[in-house]
């Protein structure tokens, strides 16, 4: 729907979620056809002929060297947990590797056939071959590579965060905190993720920043939820970032500039106007057992202070013993 008065709604998982289709489409009506006259032979319709794949030009030596070096960036893009040394590739093997990397960066590594049925957001089909052939012919491989990743600040932020956490992991990670940890120990732990933490800053302010970053209530206290969150291992943090980068690859390449966006994991709703956040508020989202749908739909109307009764399906699954 393209009416300008409609606001787009997106529910996006940033840690884990499932989804349901946003709009149910009515089944297509197949027109009835009369039977052919007796004795008439009906020929089957001709099969569609698939066009041949776009041929890929041979790589120059400079392009060959650049491509082999670029393929080492898989860890930086969240495609692998650790860098793996590989022998240089050449010829068709290298071209195939470029095609595979192009698909992975544009639409993710999960085959659409493996998507859960209830996930509504699916990546659009993408064939990297035509654009790769053009980039080779025009000697613009770096520009082609830059065009593959999602054009969102959220993805760029995750990429930068991934580099930060990989450095923390490579220097030994962080120790677990206890409930009775001293202020200096807690401050040192927070400083690993937040370089603005100083020895003279009140611990309350540093804790509040960390709590906001993790979608927690910014009490400034080292409560049970905050302690549990800070004690998540750096490897688990890296895995979560990589999963979120993959989900960004499933998103459409253009989001409506006027939209309501929900961070399911943090339970925060943000209103965007002109592609800029103008307000945010807490939202009610599900749990790992009863997950919030991942969807994209249109908001047609808003009911203020609506009467609401617990649906029987929710009552049976979540309330009744």
Predicted regions: what they are:
Residues 1-10:
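Bacterial N-terminal signal peptides that target proteins for export
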Residues 22-24:
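Boundary at the C-terminal end of the N-terminal hydrophobic targeting segment
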Residues 20, 65, 76-89, 180, ...:
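N-terminal processing/targeting junctions
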Residues 10-19:
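Bacterial N-terminal signal peptides
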Residues 26-137:
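Cationic-aromatic interfacial patches
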Residues 37-38, 124, 140-321:
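Well-ordered beta-sheet/strand-loop patches within structured domains
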């Amino acid at each position: 729907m393209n009416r300008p008065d409609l606001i787009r709604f997106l529910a996006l998982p940033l840690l884990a979620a499932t989804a349901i289709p946003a709009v149910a489409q009515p089944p297509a009506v197949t027109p009835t056809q009369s039977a052919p006259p007796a004795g008439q032979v009906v020929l089957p319709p001709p099969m569609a002929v698939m066009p041949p794949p776009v041929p890929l030009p041979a790589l120059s030596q400079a392009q060959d060297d650049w491509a082999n070096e670029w393929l080492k960036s898989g860890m930086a893009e969240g495609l692998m947990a650790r860098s793996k040394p590989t022998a240089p590739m050449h010829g068709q093997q290298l071209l195939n590797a470029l095609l595979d990397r192009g698909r992975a960066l544009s639409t993710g590594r999960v085959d659409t056939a493996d998507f859960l049925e209830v996930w509504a957001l699916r990546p659009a089909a993408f064939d990297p071959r035509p654009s790769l052939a053009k980039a080779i012919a025009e000697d613009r491989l770096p520009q082609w590579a830059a065009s593959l990743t999602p054009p969102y600040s959220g993805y760029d932020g995750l990429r930068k965060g991934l580099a930060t956490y990989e450095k923390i992991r490579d220097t030994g990670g962080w120790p677990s905190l206890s409930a009775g940890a001293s202020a200096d120990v807690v401050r040192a732990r927070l400083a690993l993720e937040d370089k603005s933490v100083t020895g003279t800053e009140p611990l309350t302010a540093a804790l509040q920043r960390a709590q906001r970053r993790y979608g927690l209530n910014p009490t400034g206290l080292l409560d049970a939820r905050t302690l549990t969150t800070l004690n998540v291992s750096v490897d688990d943090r890296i895995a979560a970032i990589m999963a979120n980068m993959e989900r960004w690859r499933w998103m459409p390449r253009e989001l409506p500039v006027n939209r309501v966006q929900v961070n399911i994991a943090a339970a925060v709703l943000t209103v965007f106007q002109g592609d800029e956040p103008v307000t945010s508020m807490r939202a009610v989202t599900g749990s790992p057992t009863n997950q919030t749908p991942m969807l994209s739909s249109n908001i047609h109307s808003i009911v203020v202070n609506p009467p609401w009764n617990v649906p029987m399906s929710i009552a049976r699954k979540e309330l009744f013993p």
